[in-house]
């Protein structure tokens, strides 16, 4: 493949069932979507991962209100922006469903997907379900999101109800939208270890990361694989015999906190002090699935200049992967504007701005430019990573990314813009956010 890697826009939209609010609302994108999309186009972007808000469209079972969706998708179509529609983003299901173990979920998902496809037959690209593996972990294994199950039995309970629904919806989409491409978007992880126990658990984590995608594709799963054996023991044998779903493009979502270093089970560090290059992690996914790739998501939480530096790193890695023969078809910084409330992993709803966007949000939620938006526009316009600035990292990002610095040593570094230098902050802030429950 040759030429610049196309950029893909995106907007965070996760619905918080406990608060009946989504991130499009807390960031005011639902009010300013025309302005936000105009900023995206001005940057030179003509593709966008765009959320379809099932939780607002089907407030009552079987009754669909497509009015707002008609407006936005019609606008994108008129403006020549190709939407990669995001049909379910994490817990973005209607409030009348009682989470991912509700037996109504599968039929409801199929009904919704059919209704969408019949209304918008011109859509060229879609994601059925954003990051299923991560969602199953947060909802079923760790108990952070509803239905708040814990342990491998909880993970299996969620997967048993959702994965067959997804494979069925995938097959139905191929019938209704035969010319559209399914962008299957999943977290992109890599684990390393030290000591015998740490190395053993890293191998377990590196096996676990592929399980959901393998099962979705109906691959023959070796019951001797450590995680597969645990899934079977937890009651998930039927997940090994799913009728396959279909993937056209694999979106790999890469964050620094996706690289863990384990000393023993339950004793790990992220971001890893010894991370492998992102291009190498992409190759692991390419060699396993042999599908066209996009970076489905990436960002770093920090100063605007730090985000610009992470953009340079991840884009450079994509260029290296492509030069080595990997079919990297797109790059998505996620999201285009700052998000909200991820400082509690959406366990609170306080409109707490999360500094991760191309454009940052001020106290009045106005969209503000910065060194990041400048660098993004350069890259989206076709500039290679070598033409992007490398800003000296600020705390806490400078601590998080210490392990990545050897991969960046060939850069010419410069100080961050004076107006983007952060005031003194608590450098103990961790990259992997801790859950903060209400009232604590």
Regions found by a protein language model. Give the residues of each.
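Active-site region of glycoside hydrolase catalytic domains
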Residues: 2-8, 70-306, 316-439
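Active-site mouth loops of central-metabolism enzymes
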Residues: 18-31, 103
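Glycan-recognition patch characteristic of GH18 chitinases/ENGases
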Residues: 10, 26-28, 34-36, 47, ...
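Surface-exposed substrate-engagement region within the catalytic domains
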Residues: 311
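N-terminal regions that are enriched for targeting/export leaders
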Residues: 3-18, 24, 38, 47-48
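Aromatic-lined carbohydrate-binding/catalytic grooves of carbohydrate-active enzymes
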Residues: 43-69, 85-88
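Short, solvent-exposed loop/turn segments at secondary-structure boundaries
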Residues: 21, 60-64, 97-100, 305-308
